[in-house]
Amino acid sequence: MVLEIVFFTSCLILSVVGVYLNLCYLRATHRSTVYPKFTGNNLRFLSVAHIVLACSNVVAAAAMWGANVNRTTKSEAFFSTTLSVSRAIPALTVFWTTVERITYNRSPTIRESPKFRYVAVFRVIEVVVSVIMEMIIRGIYLNSDDQLKEAAGLEVLQSSNDEISIKSSLIANVYYDFYHGILFLPCIIISVLMFKSAKGSHTRACLLGGMRNDQKIQNLSGQMTFFKNSYIMLYIACLADFILHVIVKRFINLEDSTLDMMYINARCFLPIVYPLSLIANNKNLRIDYFGNFILCRKARNLHKESKVKVIATRESQESIIANLKMIGILSDVDTSQGGAGAASLAMMGMGGGGAPRPPSGGRMASISKDPNSITSSGSLAKQSTASMGSGGASGMMMFHTRPKSSVPSMGSVG
């Protein structure tokens, strides 16, 4: 009983971690340009499939802990079928990623302008093919001679009201191991051949100065980048998940109930490593991922609020100074020194390349050399000054207007 509680708690924690990591990945890749559109949509769809897998693990662990779902043939059939379907797509992550790479490489339409119907059709194919293959393999195993004899014996025991223990067909079915394991070999062979072909074509195009085929060169470069940054780590993660399942199902001899709980915990591994494998070698995606690691919008934006305010304040200061210079109200100010520096220069009469002019009689000297210009030190200073920085009175800017004779009529500032 204690061991079951430990396994259930660990399954719950691992499943929650897997769901959260995949939600962070979905948030980070929303409208992201790290991957091409078709590739990004496929990876996001696979991430959703891993979320479904993690949620099914929680439900399965709760059902196994709260009720003896593997004590009758009917309950075991429903239990195994549900778990098999929920893992149908995640178990083929490498396969569908390889198929997407082939489709992306061979189809200019998908590569250049992938419409939603292409993405939808590809997703439907993924779901239908994965589920059908899982059901076919399960049917082949259950209809074998050994399983038919075992099922007949279990029906006799069940009719006598004796408590029986049925080993889950998910664990006993060896065809699943051959089916999932044999797909890794062609996937890696096809990927290596595509990588070598893309690398050779890209090298020849660059040596021949083939910038006329710029779109093709970018496509080949994208193939190589995806293989190095994402595919290799994803392949290693999925292969490790497959090896973990084989070890749990074939090399550990425990009671059926304990082995079932260990198998459910092993299913929690893939939803965790899937998003981590995609961001491991991809620097740009890793930055976006950790930038969106806090899913709560308020909490995520809280640490950005002060930085955004500083940027907005600096841009506002530079915009105000540029507008005043453009309409001739303010003399030239070096805005490259930032808002506060420009404000201090304007206050001290150091506009443009002019030399500083000391104040006379305790009053600020005018920047303009025109004797007819008007220096507003009263109400105009109160109405037209901008506080640059946090300097209080030292943040005042002296605006020097044009002579009265050159001031245009009302309604137009010129």
Curated annotation (Swiss-Prot):
Keyword Metal-binding: no
Stretch list, region Disordered: 351-414
Membrane topology field: Multi-pass membrane protein
Highest rank taxon of the organism: Eukaryota
Ranges that cross the membrane: 1-21, 45-65, 124-144, 175-195, 232-252, 259-279, 336-356
Stretches with biased composition (Polar residues): 369-383, 404-414
Protein name according to UniProt: Uncharacterized protein ZK1320.5
Classification lineage: Eukaryota, Metazoa, Ecdysozoa, Nematoda, Chromadorea
